């Protein structure tokens, strides 16, 4: 089976502007049409839930985009893989934590899409929490990693190790969900990334300015 994968991030124009993804829904639909015309039998798209600044209306736009593609290209097998946003070092979103509503948002997309015959493949929210813990963790996590290595690579091992180290580590909330100040010294501040800190702060501020921009200023479709 021949297929292509497109990283759309979201079906919302507003969210794509926040992450500086230069794609429109029309371009995505046209790509699907061309894929079918070119002999491909399936199309895979990749998105995220819980991107900083995302609202439920943005998730609705993702569902609408997928339904629009299905209607425009009947017979093309559609898959949407979706992960939870996890902050990464040396990126404009390194100061943002994991959205506490991300799991519910994945469930919303699943309900909207699977009933339409669209294959929805969410990544594990619980493992995304562990990813965020490791992504934003500092030297204090060394003992946790030793314990999980001993107990085995499972969610239960991380929970057990974190419980045993209670009082020796900041709460999970701090590492995973809290938004950090741009003036805060980060665990990786001593390392030089591809972009200087001033550039990351500038890009982060530009994205943040879009958070409260009214949805009406963007092209919106209606969720039936």
Place the predicted regions along the sequence by residue.
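Short, compositionally biased low-complexity segments
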Residues: 35-38, 76-84, 170-179
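A generic secondary-structure signal for well-formed alpha-helical elements
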Residues: 69-73, 113, 208
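Radical SAM enzyme core and accessory elements
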Residues: 115-224
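Flexible glycine/acidic-rich beta-alpha junction loops that bind and position SAM and/or redox cofactors
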Residues: 13-19, 47-57, 73-100, 116-142, ...
């Amino acid at each position: 089976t021949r297929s292509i994968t497109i990283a759309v991030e979201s079906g919302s124009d507003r969210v794509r502007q926040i992450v500086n993804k230069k794609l429109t829904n029309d371009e995505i639909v046209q790509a699907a049409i061309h894929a079918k015309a070119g002999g491909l039998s399936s199309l895979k798209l990749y998105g995220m839930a819980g991107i900083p600044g995302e609202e439920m209306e943005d998730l609705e736009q993702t569902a609408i985009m997928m339904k629009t593609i299905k209607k425009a290209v009947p017979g093309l097998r559609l898959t949407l893989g979706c992960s939870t946003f996890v902050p990464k070092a040396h990126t404009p979103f390194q100061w943002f934590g994991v959205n506490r509503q991300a799991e519910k948002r994945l469930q919303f997309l699943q309900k909207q899409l699977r009933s339409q015959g669209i294959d929805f493949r969410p990544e594990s929210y619980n493992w995304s929490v562990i990813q965020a813990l490791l992504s934003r963790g500092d030297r204090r996590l060394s003992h946790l990693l030793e314990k999980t290595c001993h107990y085995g690579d499972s969610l239960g091992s991380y929970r057990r190790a974190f419980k045993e180290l209670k009082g020796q580590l900041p709460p999970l909330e701090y590492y995973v969900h809290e938004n950090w100040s741009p003036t805060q010294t980060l665990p990786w501040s001593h390392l030089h990334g591809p972009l200087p800190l001033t550039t990351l702060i500038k890009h982060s501020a530009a994205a943040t300015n879009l958070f409260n921009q009214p949805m009406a200023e963007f092209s919106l479709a209606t969720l039936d």
